[in-house]
Amino acid sequence: MKKRKELNALIGLAGDHRRKKTKQGSGSHRLLRTEPPDSDSESSTDEEEFGAIGNRSRFVKGDYARCCKICCPLCAFVILAACVVASVGLVWMQMALKEDLDVLKEKFRTMESNQKSSFQEIPKLNEELLSKQKQLEKIESGELGLSRVWINITEMNKQISLLSSAVNHLKASVKSAADLLSLPSTVEGLQKSVASIGNTLNSVHLAVEVIQKTVDEHRTTLGLLQGSMENNGSNQILPSPSPPSELDNKSHSESAKQDILYLHNSLEEVNSTVVEYQRQNDLKLKGMSETLSNLTQRLSLIESHVVALSKAEQRTNVSSSTMENRAATLKRESLVTNRSDTVQAQSMKKEDNSNSQVSELREKLQLISALTNKPESNRPPETTDEEQVQNFTSDPSALPEFSQLLRNQIETQVKPLSLPGISSIKDLQDLFHKTGQDVDGMLTYQELWNSLGSAMPRPESLRAFDSNGDGRYSFLELRLALGI
């Protein structure tokens, strides 16, 4: 590039001299050249172009020098200003760092002093915590602590409740003084009722035995009927019988077979009813034995309390607390006796119902025996068997009606109910405790429905086991209803 610039400069300086020489020696050149005169114009144009190029290069060089003169100081000023600003910033940052370092040093010093003081205060705090823990333990389990205060409060509540119950028992004992005088008569009545219950149970056992004997007799009559039917079939194999008599014999034999089947079914149902009655009687006997044991225990308690009361009346210096307790126990025993009276009345009613059912069964069995035991003296010797079958099966609809009646009676009176969630005596006791009552209490249908839900049976089905018809069910009634 430098060589190019030097050539351009030399060409620019030599341009003027050449122009002058061309003007002076244009003729000599023309003489020396072999070219035509028109070539002078071409050479002149070339020279003009070369001169223009030289002038242009000189102008570019001057502009470049001027730009350098302006830009160099400006760049130097900018660089100097940037250096000054950077130095000022560095100085300011150094000052800020020194201040921050001083602040950090002061903080470290304060932290060290605080740590030293905290190390000295830690054992003091531990001692204070231990003392406070000891004070809390004294407050909780000391002689005047919270536990002792709570025990005293509970004891006071118990004493207050005992005093209130004693006052209530005193009030009730004042009212039940007349009942205490009539205790011996009530005890005698209970003994008589227990004896009557035993007699009724014995009569029920005898009735069941009689029913079993009648069932055995009916079985023997059925065997005789079957033998007579077989003899009738053997007698029917005779020569040349008329066609209508054969048809009659076939119809009579079929009807006799149907009647025998009906009799078998009825006897099976009677047997099932007898078994159910035996089961019910066993349950009733168990319940009665339990009630008798409870009654004997309660009677012994009543007698002991009566003796204690008689002795207490003779003594004049008996304390009021013992009198209150005895009056309370006597009131409880009177309530127990009243409940036992109600239970006995219910059991008597149930026994009456069972006796009525047994009498109905006896009547129906007598009807069966009357149907089966027709007199045979007024019959001719040839047609005795056929007439016996005809008389026995003259009313074939009576046997299914009788079996239907027995079935309905079994389903309505013997079939136990089912309560949801109750399958044993313990579950039934839990139900009574859940409703807030003892085993001696009574439950209504609404209380049973509230405790067992919508799966309860209808009130009509439970009403069959309500002996006194008051709409309240005792433990024994629900036990009989469930068959447990």
UniProtKB/Swiss-Prot annotation:
Q: Which cysteines are joined by disulfide bonds?
A: none
Q: Does the keyword Phosphoprotein apply?
A: no
User: In this protein, which residues make up the domain named EF-hand?
Assistant: 423-452, 453-484
Q: Polar residues bias located where? A: 228-239, 315-324, 335-347
Q: Which UniProt keywords apply?
A: Calcium, Metal-binding, Repeat
Which residues hold Ca(2+)? 466, 468, 470, 472, 477
Q: Does the keyword Aminoacyl-tRNA synthetase apply?
A: no
Residue ranges, compositional bias (Acidic residues): 37-48
The segments labelled Disordered in the record are 1-48, 227-255, 313-395
| Gene Ontology MF term list | metal ion binding
Query: What is this protein identified as?
Result: EF-hand calcium-binding domain-containing protein 14
Q: What organism does the record attribute this protein to?
A: Mus musculus
